[in-house]
Swiss-Prot record:
Its cofactor is Mg(2+). It catalyses: tRNA(Phe) + L-phenylalanine + ATP = L-phenylalanyl-tRNA(Phe) + AMP + diphosphate + H(+). Its EC number is 6.1.1.20. Keywords: Aminoacyl-tRNA synthetase, ATP-binding, Cytoplasm, Ligase, Magnesium, Metal-binding, Nucleotide-binding, Protein biosynthesis. Tetramer of two alpha and two beta subunits. The gene is pheS. The lineage of its organism: Bacteria, Pseudomonadati, Pseudomonadota, Gammaproteobacteria, Enterobacterales. It comes from the Bacteria. Binds 2 magnesium ions per tetramer. This is Phenylalanine--tRNA ligase alpha subunit. It comes from Escherichia coli (strain K12). NCBIfam families: pheS. Transmembrane segments: none annotated.
């Protein structure tokens, strides 16, 4: 009992020196635990006369209460300090700009397709589609390219078997459309096509768009006027345009269309011609009554010319540094 005041003072000193909650708990066990210094003081009561024990017990309990209060106060201080330190470490500078949600953008080839569809849509063309896995009839035979025709050698075709292939052109869509409906016909046919070629200006898969008109009294003049308007609208310039005689099995006469580039050189942009009478006969349309014109162009080619891209493969490499330029 004589050491009670010293024990309380010693406990309070240890409590004030505890640097964290774990150290503080060690002090609690040392003084108030089952075998703690103040707890053991209760065992000295048996040495006192019975009439003195209640008063002595009250003094010991008062000492334990003082130490418990000191423990509680110090624990609150340590927990508050720990919370403040954590908040300081996790602080947010509200003056910093927020993380902006970046909007996506259309792929440049998609932008080109949309632009062309919009232009021809205003001229009354509808969009037609067809299968990418095609048969040799729709891809070759019906287009005046029979099995013995030398033009078949010009296509590096991906064949599945002797009759099925990945289409090399979207012209098969024209055949399917003409077989399904009678003139007047006015369609454009965008889609993916496949050829076994890969270099700076060719990829095994690329996008093509073909156009077709079949009606009475359609002439080459109609074809030239349509393509003149289209190219000047697409490039947004009053371009110098020329038509060169060419050869395609499915058109007669045929032409390739060039535009004058900024470097003063002619650049080929598309092929076109009047629908060959044999093609019309193959789909049950009388070439003595109806005529038509067709044209075809590569979407990547036009996109390269419009945006000044030098390597076609850039469109398929998914490099965001490249693609973000077109947003």
């Amino acid at each position: 009992m004589s050491h009670l005041a010293e024990l309380v003072a010693s406990a309070k000193a240890a409590i004030s020196q505890a640097s964290d909650v774990a150290a503080l708990d060690n002090v609690r066990v040392e003084y108030l635990g089952k075998k703690g210094h103040l707890t053991l003081q209760m065992t000295t009561l048996r040495e006192l006369p019975p009439e003195e024990r209640p008063a002595a017990g009250a003094v010991i309990n008062e000492a334990k209460e003082q130490v418990q209060q000191a423990l509680n106060a110090r624990k609150a201080e340590l927990e508050s300090a720990a919370l403040n330190a954590r908040l300081a470490a996790e602080t947010i500078d509200v003056s910093l700009p927020g993380r902006r949600i970046e909007n996506g953008g259309l792929h440049p080839v998609t932008r080109t397709i949309d632009r062309i569809e919009s232009f021809f849509g205003e001229l009354g063309f509808t969009v037609a589609t067809g299968p990418e896995i095609e048969d040799d009839y729709h891809n070759f035979d019906a287009l005046n390219i029979p099995g013995h025709h030398p033009a078949r050698a010009d296509h590096d075709t991906f064949w599945f078997d002797t009759t099925r292939l990945l289409r090399t052109q979207t012209s098969g869509v024209q055949i399917r459309t003409m077989k399904a409906q009678q003139p007047p016909i006015r369609i454009i046919a965008p889609g993916r096509v496949y050829r076994n070629d890969y270099d700076q200006t060719h990829t095994p898969m690329f996008h093509q768009m073909e156009g077709l008109i079949v009606d009475t009294n359609i002439s080459f003049t109609n074809l030239k006027g349509t393509l003149h308007d289209f190219l000047r609208n697409f490039f947004e310039e009053d371009l110098q345009i020329r038509f060169r005689p060419s050869y395609f099995p499915f058109t007669e006469p045929s032409a390739e269309v060039d535009v004058m580039g900024k470097n003063g050189k002619w650049l080929e942009v598309l092929g076109c011609g009047m629908v060959h009478p044999n093609v019309l006969r193959n789909v049950g349309i009388d070439p003595e009554v109806y005529s038509g014109f067709a044209f075809g162009m590569g979407m990547e080619r036009l996109t390269m010319l419009r945006y000044g891209v030098t390597d076609l493969r850039s469109f398929f490499e998914n490099d965001l540094r490249f693609l973000k330029q077109f947003k």
